[in-house]
Curated annotation (Swiss-Prot):
Segments in the Cytoplasmic topological domain: 140-185
One cellular component (GO) term of this entry: lumenal side of endoplasmic reticulum membrane
Listed name of the protein: H-2 class I histocompatibility antigen, alpha chain
Similarity comment text for this entry: Belongs to the MHC class I family.
Ig-like C1-type domain span: 19-107
GO biological process, one term: antigen processing and presentation of peptide antigen via MHC class I
Transmembrane parts of this sequence: 119-139
Membrane topology: Single-pass membrane protein
Length: 185
């Protein structure tokens, strides 16, 4: 029975859960930036996080917290470095853990700027307006082509001179029985 418990325990003890890692960006009042490399949800607890500047490992200027339990049987850890604003892309975080087939190399990825979204929306709006105007122009031109360019197939009724008739020219004395026999005077 002891052998069976050891066999079942090995599956738990020998398991490896690779870390889920990402980098966050935090502006400081001093005008520079803190980059923080997070490793979450890993097992076993042994992990190494390092920061590099242009490929050279930083050791002195890095803040590193101890590995902590996450409360779900896995662990978490972070390492941070303070960098000049605008130089964030020169820094990379390396994550070493036995659950990873090879070490991870992470860099802070700035979110897409709202300015680029505004440009995209404006361009799409202009293109949409041009498409609508083009469709209207094409419709009008096609309609004119079909009518010979005269604006329509209208002709006067036979025997009519104009449409300027007055009510006095009408010969009917009544509007008919449907109108209650009202008379024109």
């Amino acid at each position: 029975w002891l052998h069976r418990y050891l066999k079942n325990g090995n599956a738990t003890l020998l398991r490896t859960d690779p870390p889920k890692a990402h980098v966050t960006h935090h502006r400081r009042p001093e005008g520079d930036v803190t980059l923080r490399c997070w490793a979450l949800g890993f097992y076993p607890a042994d992990i190494t996080l390092t920061w590099q500047l242009n490929g050279e490992e930083l050791t002195q200027d890095m803040e590193l917290v101890e590995t902590r339990p996450a409360g779900d049987g896995t662990f978490q850890k972070w390492a941070s470095v303070v960098v000049p604003l605008g130089k964030e892309q020169n820094y990379t975080c390396r994550v070493y853990h036995e659950g990873l087939p090879e070490p991870l190399t992470l860099r802070w990825e700035p979110p897409p700027s709202t300015d680029s979204y505004m440009v995209i929306v404006a361009v799409l709006g202009v293109l949409g307006a041009m498409a609508i105007i083009g469709a209207v122009v094409a419709f009008v031109m096609k309609r004119r082509r079909n009518t010979g360019g005269k604006g329509g197939d209208y002709a006067l009724a036979p025997g009519s001179q104009s449409s300027e008739m007055s009510l006095r020219d009408c010969k009917g004395d009544t509007l008919g029985s449907d109108w209650g026999g009202a008379m024109w005077t």
